[in-house]
From Swiss-Prot:
GO terms for biological process: cellular response to acidic pH. It comes from the Bacteria. Belongs to the AriR family. It comes from Escherichia coli O1:K1 / APEC. Regulates expression of genes involved in acid-resistance and biofilm formation. May be a non-specific DNA-binding protein that binds genes and/or intergenic regions via a geometric recognition. Transmembrane segments: none annotated. This is Regulatory protein AriR. Homodimer. One of its GO terms (molecular function) is DNA binding. Gene3D superfamilies: 1.20.5.5260.
Length: 88
């Protein structure tokens, strides 16, 4: 996975990036999930915007069979949705 600074700089929604950056260890697992989603988007050449992050997280949620991991993905998705404008 890419370095945290690179991941946060790639996120187009700076308020979302700042929220995760300032959370410290409170959202450690969620930050890792977000980081993986952003890394996947960057490696595939997609724009790192909220819409694509949401789609990536939904895909991860649909494909995991691990209940605990699904819960972390769901929490991450909820946070991203809070920072997403209604007019997507």
């Amino acid at each position: 996975m890419l370095e945290d600074t690179t991941i946060h700089n790639a996120i187009s929604d700076k308020a979302l990036s700042s929220y995760f950056r300032s959370s410290g260890n409170l959202l450690e697992e969620e930050s890792a999930v977000l980081g993986q989603a952003v890394t996947n988007l960057m490696l595939s050449g997609d724009n790192v915007n909220n819409k694509n992050i949401i789609l990536s997280l939904i895909h991860s949620l649909e494909t995991t069979s691990d209940i605990l991991k699904a819960d972390v993905i769901r929490k991450t998705l909820e946070i991203v949705l809070r920072y997403t404008a209604d007019d997507m």
